[in-house]
Curated annotation (Swiss-Prot):
A Pfam family that the UniProt record links to this protein: DSS1_SEM1
GO BP terms: mRNA export from nucleus; proteasome assembly; response to hydrogen peroxide
Organism: Arabidopsis thaliana (Mouse-ear cress)
Alphabetic keyword roster: Proteasome
Superkingdom classification of source: Eukaryota
Entry function: Subunit of the 26S proteasome which plays a role in ubiquitin-dependent proteolysis. Also associates with the TREX-2 complex that is required for transcription-coupled mRNA export.
Entries under InterPro entries matching the protein: DSS1_SEM1 (IPR007834)
GO annotation, cellular component aspect: proteasome regulatory particle, lid subcomplex
The keyword Transmembrane is annotated on this UniProt entry: no
Name listed for the protein in its UniProt record: Protein DSS1 HOMOLOG ON CHROMOSOME V
């Protein structure tokens, strides 16, 4: 059998920084920074965010498991 010629393999170079061209650079506008006020962040949950309903099945089961684990120690 005759040796078959190898197909030319084309190596594609990937430019890792090619995507950087898609974003436009903006200068920092100091007037905009001065006008922006720091707004007080409202609480997203109560300070005591624990589940108020301790009578649900999960709470009872968890409490039972914790008691069993502490007894085994």
């Amino acid at each position: 059998m005759a040796a078959e010629p190898k197909a030319a393999v084309e190596v594609v170079k990937v430019d890792l920084f090619e995507d950087d061209d898609e974003f436009e650079e903006f200068e920092i506008n100091e007037d905009w920074l001065e006008k922006e006020e720091v707004k007080e962040v409202s609480l997203q949950w109560e300070d005591d965010w624990d589940d108020d309903d301790v009578s649900d099945d999960f709470s009872r089961q968890l409490k039972k498991e914790l008691e069993n684990a502490s007894e085994k120690k």
